[in-house]
Amino acid sequence: MNKNKRLLVMAGGTGGHVFPGLAVAKKLQQEGWEIRWLGTADRMEADLVPKHGIEIDFIKVKGLRGQGIIRMLAAPFKIVGAILQARKYIKAWQPDVVLGMGGYVSGPGGIAAWLSGVPVVLHEQNAVAGLTNQWLSRIAAKVLQAFPGAFANKDVVGNPVRQDVTALASPQERFAGRQGPVRILVMGGSQGARILNQTLPEVAGLLGDKVTIWHQAGKGSLQVTEQAYAKSTNVPHKVTEFIDDVAAAYAWADVVVCRSGALTVSELSAAGVGAIFVPFMHKDRQQALNADHLVQCGAAKMIEQMDLTAAGLAEELNQLDREVLKQMAVAAREAAIVDADVRVADVIKSLARK
């Protein structure tokens, strides 16, 4: 009797790593695969993954950036300890394939899998490869990337996104008969973005009754953002800390003003929604490069944070009537790789058969 194939997913830290991993896990679960997760106990995967019916094991590992000299000297011992922890879990569960989706956990987990003779599939979500994935790419059986350029000559498969997002109606259907104020969705990620929380209330005041706004302010920023809107405008608006049903929010929106993390960019493309991106400023310009493809194909605009002003953003939005926004939405959907979960799953299955 053949036992079910087994996949160990290594992902942690942020939704940009965890949610694509969950999308692939769900796809393979539907095909009878057993899934287990490797993460850290103090990050979001510890709560989120079990809610999806997936068992999770934890190793102790943290990033090295910004650490003091004493901690840096102790780091090699901690990394070896984390590798040994991961190898113990791998030996006990015996996965057929290990999938690394990024985060600190992927480093020790990937090395442990390689030492155990288990094939490692890497998936890089961003247009600039993270340090962990750069190292692991040397020992991985297969390296995949969401956007071209993270690795030279590696397969571009897109970012796996949630099925409720890929299942949304087409932009043409959603925009048909839509009237009234332009619907602006503001998203700064689960932690919010202070610059957007400060700027959008002023933008609302400048645009007046031309717009209505749904604003995700992020944890701990609800009250101050709501007060900023009350001070600036009487434009219809809704401010929430989080948006639980992001697919419904995308379906509602005419345009999204947001950061350009890898998952956000991929979800907007899959949903078919135009965007104005305000990338997080980072020395490697990771978020700006994530957004570049949608900007180039006419699905999005980009304003660097240093150039962002309420007046400038209001002027940009004022030029985007609903017909233009529909064209941007159509371009976004046409640029999407909506079967990224299938593509990653197919690679995993091919390695499991060897």
From Swiss-Prot:
This protein's name: UDP-N-acetylglucosamine--N-acetylmuramyl-(pentapeptide) pyrophosphoryl-undecaprenol N-acetylglucosamine transferase
Q: How does it sit in the membrane?
A: Peripheral membrane protein
Could you tell me which HAMAP family the record lists for this protein?
Answer: MurG
What's in the keyword line of the UniProt record?
Cell cycle, Cell division, Cell inner membrane, Cell membrane, Cell shape, Cell wall biogenesis/degradation, Glycosyltransferase, Membrane, Peptidoglycan synthesis, Transferase
Q: Which InterPro entries match?
A: GlcNAc_MurG, Glyco_trans_28_C, GlycoTrans_28_N
**Protein family according to the UniProt entry:** Belongs to the glycosyltransferase 28 family. MurG subfamily.
Organism this protein belongs to: Photobacterium profundum (strain SS9)
Q: Where is the signal peptide?
A: none
State the Gene Ontology terms under molecular function.
UDP-N-acetyl-D-glucosamine:N-acetylmuramoyl-L-alanyl-D-glutamyl-meso-2,6-diaminopimelyl-D-alanyl-D-alanine-diphosphoundecaprenol 4-beta-N-acetylglucosaminlytransferase activity; undecaprenyldiphospho-muramoylpentapeptide beta-N-acetylglucosaminyltransferase activity
Cross-referenced NCBIfam families: murG
